[in-house]
Amino acid sequence: MSQEYDYIIVGAGSAGNTLATRLTEDEGVTVLLLEAGGPDYRLDFRTQMPAALAFPLQGRRYNWAYETDPEPHMDGRRMECGRGKGLGGSSLINGMCYIRGNAMDYDNWAKLPGLENWTYLDCLPYFRKAETRDIGPNDYHGGEGPVSVTTPKAGNNPLFHAMVEAGVQAGYPRTDDLNGYQQEGFGPMDRTVTKNGRRASTARGYLDTAKKRSTLTIVTHALTDKVLFEGKRAVGVRYLIGAAEERVEARARKEVLVCSGAIASPQLLQRSGVGPAKLLESLDIPVVHDLPGVGENLQDHLELYLQYACTQPVSLYPSLLWYNQPAIGAEWLFNGTGIGASNQFEAGGFIRSRPEFDWPNIQYHFLPVAINYNGSNGVKEHGFQAHMGSMRSPSRGRVQLKSKNPRDYPSILFNYMATEQDWQEFRDGIRLTREIMQQPALDPYRGREISPGIDVQTDEQLDKFIREHAETAFHPSCSCKMGTDEMAVVDGEGRVHGMQGLRVVDASIMPIITTGNLNAPTIMIAEKIADKIRGRQPLPRSTADYYVAGDAPVRGKPLREVGPTAQ
C-alpha cells in the first residue's frame, strides 16, 4: 500500500525538522517525515541534560557511530565519525555550541556562480528567524524563533573569564558576541539550551509545534532504502521499518527532500542511482543520473586539546566523581539549574594564526575540566583545557557506497591533514595556545601542562602529537555541494542538478565549511530554502554592520612575551 504526501523529508535532523515545521505552516500541505532513529525520549538525561553531552556519543541508540577508512596522514587511524540518530538528528547529541560562522564565510560562498544570494546579509535574517535568545533580540539576534539560545551568566566558572582575559592579554581582540558584529576575538559562547536548562534540539524547538498538525506524519525507525524516480523526476521513497525486511513505499506529489546529513545524504543518492556512474555501475546500481560530485568535497573540522592542571579547586573535576553526581542531577531535574544545565563550553574564541588569513582560521572552545570530549580519559585532578582546531582545511575527502544494502555503512575518508597548510596551522595553533595559557590572567590557576606536555616542542614532536591525538569536531559537511561547476550536486536552492522534484537540504550542500560549529548554519540553510520551496519572498536583507579585518594586524603586543619553549 502506498501513501501519498505533498513532500517527503528523509531525515529528522536539524534541517529536516526545520523544513517539516515550515512546510506544514501552509494550510493543507501534507508532509511525511522519515527518521531512521527513534524518538527523543524526554526522560533520558543522556540527551536532555546539557552537561551529559558525552553520553549519547557512547553506544548506538542515538549515534550512527560511523568510522572512517584508515586515514593516510594520521598514522592509518580509523577515526570516529559520530552522527545523530533519532528525532533531532545531530542536534540531539551535539555539544550545543551556538556558533553561526563568520560573515566572510557566507560572503565568500556568494562569490561562487549561482550562489549570489547567500551573502551574510541575506543569511542573517534567517539566523534571526530561527532563534530566541534569552536576553532578547537585536540586529543580530532573534526573539521569537524555535531555537532557544542561552547566554553565559555572571557567576559562572571563574576559569571561563580567566581564559578569555588570557586571550585578550595575548594581544587578541575581545568580543562580547561571537555571533554578533565581530566573531574574531575571545568572548562568551552561547549554547542551544532552553530556559529550563534542557537541550534545545530541533525536535524540541521545531517538532513540538509541528507534530500537533494533522498534516505532518512522523515515522521513526524508518530507514530509507532509496528515492523512487520516473525518468528524472523523484516521485517517492521506499523505506524499511525497524528490523523488518519488507519495503514500504510512499509517494510525493511535489518533492522529495533529502536531509540525511553529510554522510547519509550522498549515500542515499548513490543508492538511488544518482552519483558517479562508475561507482554505481561497479555496484550494479542502475544509473538514473551521472552526477560525479555526489559524496565528493567532504570536509570537517579537526581539533585537539591542550590540557593543564589547575592549582585551585575551581574546575569541574568534582562533578566527574560518582558520589557528587546525584545532587547535580537532582538540581538539574527539578530546578533546571546548576552544573547540569550547561554544556560547559561557555567561553571561546576565533583568531587568525597568520596575516594571510582574511578571517579567523583557528577556533577555541574552553572547558573548565581536563577530559576527552566523549567522556573518556578524565584527568584525575583539577584541570582545564583549550580545544583548538583549524577552520577551513584545504583537505578534501569523500563518501562512497559499499553495497546496495541500506543497513551497510558507506566508506568514509576525510583525508585529514593532507596538505602542508594543515600541518602549519596546527603547529602554529599549539604554539599560540601555549602563549595564551602563559598570560597573567591564568597565573592563579595554571599548573603543569598535562598534554601535549612540556617536552613536545619541535615541529617533528608536534606533528607526532597531532597525528596521534587530533580528532574530529563532528562537523562533516560539503559532500553534496551547492554551485554550478561540474562537481556541484545542487543549485543555490538545494535542487539536484539534472533532476526534478528532488532537493538536498542539510550541511552537505555547503560549498565550503563555515568557521565554527555547524548546527546553527544548518538550521539557517533549511529556513532559507524553506521559503524557496513555499514560493515565498525571501526575508529582506539585513542592514546590520559587520566586522571585516582588512589590514588590521592579527594581534597586538602580548602582555607577557613568551619564548618558544617557555611553559
UniProtKB/Swiss-Prot annotation:
One record GO biological process: glycine betaine biosynthetic process from choline
Statement: the UniProt record of this protein carries the keyword Flavoprotein: yes
SUPFAM superfamilies cross-referenced by the UniProt entry: FAD-linked reductases, C-terminal domain, FAD/NAD(P)-binding domain
List of catalytic residues: H475 (proton acceptor)
Annotated binding of FAD, by residue: 6-35
Highest taxon above the source species: Bacteria
UniProt catalytic activity: choline + A = betaine aldehyde + AH2; betaine aldehyde + NAD(+) + H2O = glycine betaine + NADH + 2 H(+)
A GO MF label: choline dehydrogenase activity
Keyword field contains Translocase: no
Metabolic or biological pathway: Amine and polyamine biosynthesis; betaine biosynthesis via choline pathway; betaine aldehyde from choline (cytochrome c reductase route): step 1/1
A GO CC term assigned to this protein in UniProt: membrane
Stretches assigned to coiled coil: none
EC number: 1.1.99.1, 1.2.1.8
Keywords noted in UniProt: FAD, Flavoprotein, NAD, Oxidoreductase
Family matches, as NCBIfam families: betA, PRK02106.1
Primary role: Involved in the biosynthesis of the osmoprotectant glycine betaine. Catalyzes the oxidation of choline to betaine aldehyde and betaine aldehyde to glycine betaine at the same rate.
Name of the protein: Oxygen-dependent choline dehydrogenase
Protein species of origin: Pseudomonas fluorescens (strain SBW25)
